Amino acid sequence: NGMLSAGDRTFIGDPNPDFTFGFTNNFTYKNWYMDLLVTGSQGGDIYNASRFELEMMDDHKYQSTIVLNRWTTPGDITNVPKANAQNAKLVSDRFIEDGSYIKLKSVTLGYNFAQPFKGVTKLNVYVTGQNLYTWTNYSGFDPEVNAFATTNGVLGIDYGTYPQVRTFVFGLKANF
């Protein structure tokens, strides 16, 4: 009938990935070494509630520039509905996104000194980076999300979830 109603509602999306994976390896060359961890997930839908808030067009919140592409006149071709109070707050499949990703989770690069100093039997310097890069088509900050950073009971909902922190650690190991 051209009107959205409660009868049009259905379950959409599945937050469970088809599979998850990880790859770890270490490489050595002379006194240098590198440890590597890559993780990922294939499939699994994410409801991007952050986008929902930014594209709702129903209150006085700041809006994303995507709402400039909203439907305004008959004949417009767009996936952004017209701004009105009736349908702006309805959950829509346009906020469901593929949560697949590959993440460079951790890399450590180190050097073992062959001739430690007097009184030092072993000396190693290293740098480790974590959460270095994510390959994904997900439009949010990080596809590893759950609402309000809580339990898996709300898996697959991104409602202002902060991305995982990128960290760098510089270290020195010495045995005396």
Q: At which residue positions do the language-model features occur?
A:
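Flexible, solvent-exposed coil segments and beta strand-coil junctions
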Residues: 1-6, 79-93, 147-154
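Extracytoplasmic gating/loop element in the C-terminal half of outer-membrane beta-barrel translocons
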Residues: 41-124, 128-130
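Conserved small-residue
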Residues: 1-15, 130-132, 137-140
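Membrane-embedded beta-strand positions of outer-membrane beta-barrel proteins
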Residues: 36, 125-127, 172
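Repeated loop/turn-to-beta-strand initiation elements of outer-membrane beta-barrel proteins
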Residues: 31-36, 116-117
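Outer-membrane beta-barrel pore domains and translocons
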Residues: 28, 39-41, 128-132, 175
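Residues that define the transmembrane beta-barrel architecture of outer-membrane proteins
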Residues: 17-21, 100-105, 164-168
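C-terminal beta-signal and terminal closure region of outer-membrane beta-barrel proteins
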Residues: 64, 75-76, 136-176
